[in-house]
Amino acid sequence: MSSDEILMVLINQVEKLQQDKDFDKANQLDDFIYKWLGLSDLKRCSLQERGFSLDTYLVYLHNRACLYLNQLDIPKVLNSVRLFRYFCPSNMIYGDIGISVAICEADVDMRLGKTDNAKSRLYDLLERTQNPYHLARINRMLGELENPYLQFDGIKGNLEQLSQALGYAEKMRDKREIAETYLNIGNVLVSSHPALGLSMIWQAQIIAERNGDSHQVLSAKLSRTCVDIRLMLKYANRGVDMSVFEKDAKDVVLSIDRCKLQSDVEKAFYDECRGMVLDDDESLYEALGFFRTHHAYGKVFNIAQNIAWHAVCKKDFLTVRKILDVCYDAAVKMNDSVKIKAVLQAMKQFKDL
């Protein structure tokens, strides 16, 4: 076998391990490949001398970015993207594999809370591809970016983007992308049409269950729980009976066995949800630790806010002041002036308590 053929066998093996959610072995094999290819020292990394084709190298770096994006390992995703850009000729930057890598970059921007960067990147990509798979992902991400809970006039635009995404996904018969888009449509609709939004999330869960995708089933369940919480907060002071939503949220959280979750990412999302539903600070701190380690500053800010609120309710002002420092750091990392201003005001309020 040639060096190229051996590399493709190893790439496919990593992909299979990732599909099986065996991330420990996938990461170990990737670490071996990375060192074997000499990517830690680009001055000594010669493709032709070692018998590798450029195309195979680019496939490896693309897959590596996706592998670590699925684990929220932002530094390794960005390292893979940087190496891809280093090796990729200018005429391939906007080919299919180049577009896919750029979508990964936009996903990283979203997770870091850099929404303006993500939008700019995605709208640029929208003009550069006709691939239905890429169009489905781009439109879905753009629909997700306009946060309907903060910007109600953006809902119509969100649905237009997501409807296009659903059309592309159905055209490809990509069940995973279809379920993901239903999930996002549900999250958009729930603020104005709660019953319809929840039905879309249920539909996403049903599709994922039929497809045997345990990760996506979990995502739908936790999304349902977050919607229940939002509805309880929205109608808390309006005399509406929220017991149905409260029961559903608790039932979902308690039905999930954390020990059976297959990856650290799944456990972190579960911990966040459990912490919010059951007022469990220990779970919230577990989630906070994971997302801080992986530089997911949007998540860090939201979870720290929840911990701070619990501490305020307990009049534990020392914890409030400590956790506001975490909020401030996350807001600065996101370069979000609105959040920075809000945290500084809160710090001033609790300074002498």
Q: Language-model segments: which ranges?
A:
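N-terminal leader/linker segments that initiate helical-solenoid repeat arrays
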Residues: M1-Y34, D55
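Amphipathic alpha-helical segments of tetratricopeptide repeats
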Residues: D31-C45, V81-S90, Y123-N131, L162-D174, ...
